[in-house]
Amino acid sequence: MDPGQLWIQFYAQIFLETGSNMQDVNMPTCQQNWDQINQEQNHLIWEQYALQDAQPEGFEDQLQQQLNNEQLAAFNQVLASVQNDLGVTFFLDGPAGTGKTFLYWTLCTTLCAQGKILICVASSGLAALLLPGGKTSHSVFKIPIEIKEDSTCNISKRSELAALIACTDLIIWDEVPMQHRFCAEAFNCTCKDIANHPDKPFGGITVVFGGDFHQTLPVIPKGTPEQIVAACLKESPLWAGMEKMRLTHNMHLQHGDAEMAEFATWLLGIGEGLQIPQGTTSSETAFKQSMLVESRDSLINKIYGNLDQLPQLNDEYFHSCTILTPWNDDVLILNKIILRKFPGEMQIFHSADKVIYEAGVDDERLGTLSTEYLNSLNSGSIPLSDLELKEGCPVMILCNLACSQGVCNGTCDIVTCIGSHVLELWLLTGSEVGNTVFIPRISLTPQRLSLASNFPGPNFQFKLHLL
């Protein structure tokens, strides 16, 4: 093949991985029969076979031998459904640390060894990185961002994706409690249409949903507790038809750490509603005196007391240092305080915010929105207008830039070099830990702000991640 055509096909493959194509940006397409050269007709199915070929021989047996009794029972249930073409829909429930991800890997390696085709997705890019070949459910299944009760996935029956779904033996969908139930319902309708089996859930495909309802539930802006519960998968008509499986044994506590075990039990009790003081509301929790600190400065010094030794600290330091808070405003305040404790020179990057007028929106108020007001907005999904950084500080990526390379929403990184338009980062979490990546300034148009219009602001798409 002509070298120029090889480069065109190389870039075309990158576009396909992001759900786009060369025609979208008016770039030339490959003129030679690439399908024939690679003996493939569907690149999505070919990717699944590539996963099978990459698996070490006998790896599935090693994983199966490590399953505990609860995991083995769930493993056998799912395996029977796939091998007998039963099309059962499961929900795997279990708190963090009970081995849900390990069970997913064991299922995937076993079925890949048998030549089965499977799709692994999760609600977020970070969770997807923990699954074999994992991607976000929205990107794979083309789920609308603005989901409604009657929404369907944007998948044509004649597309390569539809062909992949039609021959899929198992779908694993992790962290589904975080997503609106309409997402699963939309995909259910789409699968029925693709498989021409309107009477079978998900068109007769075996599906394993997984997650923990003790953790983050669907985010409903300004929603009441009742509205949040109504958005959960448990309120979906699909829930009654699911086979429930539960894991309870915390694999992280099998080394005898008594203090950690006590904390895990206390934390689980909060989720079960067992830590509510008598005579108080359900939103209040009793903390032990040993968990409390005297002041904000005491908390910062307790967690980040060695920042003056930053050049000598390794990546494990930031793995073990985190402060959690539910409010973005508190995150902003604490991050500013802690960042000033880092050695080195502070550098500030400014975004270029402006209002974009949408078709059909005629609101005189939009013309009165000043740049200062736009700069003052603080949302969890967009970076700050003024981004303060120092070399050596941790940051968190806010969008899925390159999931296959471990750069996705929620990935934590260390800033190793600061340029005017590009930053060099060292990956701290995810599937590509230890790799170096380069992040440019990017324009972003948020869709969920309390404005009648959107605005883009070219800047680096991450936030300081000291919390």
What is each model feature region?
Residues 2-467:
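RecA-like helicase/translocase P-loop NTPase motor core
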